[in-house]
Amino acid sequence: MATEVMQENVETAANVLNHWQGHRRVTRRTIDAFPEEKLFQFAVGGMRPFADLVWEMIRMVMPITDGVATGKWEEFKGEKPETKSELLKVWDAQTKALDERFPTIPQHRFSEVDTAFGQWTMTGLATIQYGIDNEIHHRGQGYVYLRALGIEPPHFWERD
């Protein structure tokens, strides 16, 4: 008698997108918690201001998504925002673009190995996870800044 093994893929593209967008919602609330001047100027221990860290996140989101989708790895093109409202406007536009673009990634691209931006050789899914991990890491720096400013950061588990 043969035993049949069923494998269920619980890491669907929709789950990955939902997970990523959950983190993006928390990061957006983190950006919003900063006073305008502190967002662009305050830093601790020689680290960059949070606005610079957010700009790095912004410069990764769509290039990673498009690169995984197409295999073409192009740098982000856009002007760096100079105000909190401009930064949030770019963030929100990317959130919408991510919702539109992510579902078009061909399923096979998640498991294909590629070299993103000529430097990271990994599967498409791992590249996306790298982008998410980078956001979490930098948001953690933002939490330290907020606490140093006497501001309670948003709860990281509230992703809605």
For each feature predicted by the language model, list its residue ranges.
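Soluble or luminal CAZymes and related metallo-dependent hydrolases
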Residues: 8, 19-23, 90-93
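Secondary-structure transition/hinge residues
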Residues: 35, 99, 103-106, 150
